[in-house]
Structures are given as structure tokens and as C-alpha cells.
Amino acid sequence: MPIIHVELVEGRTKEQKKQLGEAITKAAVDIVNVPADAVKLIFVDMKKDDYMEGGI
């Protein structure tokens, strides 16, 4: 059973997360060869102030 953590900067809609979750689940089913109901996704929304890229 894969447990996949997805961290995103806040601001994504529920629909965007749903579509991303469906795509990730399909990839896990195709690549790891597990049934879709065995794939667990955990979405974490990060505040923009809690994220930094390139030291900025």
C-alpha cells in the first residue's frame, strides 16, 4: 500500500487536488501494480511564508 505525501503551496482548489490525486493514483496503479483503493494520498498545504526556493 503506497502512502504518498504531496506538499503544495496553499491556493490550490479542491478540484485541482482531486485531479492531481486521480493522476497520482493512476500512476501508482500503472507503475507499482497496486489496486487504486490501496493508494493513500496525504495533501499538505504550506503557507507561502513557510516555503523558500533558492534562498529567497
Label every PLM stretch briefly.
Residues P2-I56:
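A domain-level signal for the structural core that forms small-molecule/cofactor-binding pockets
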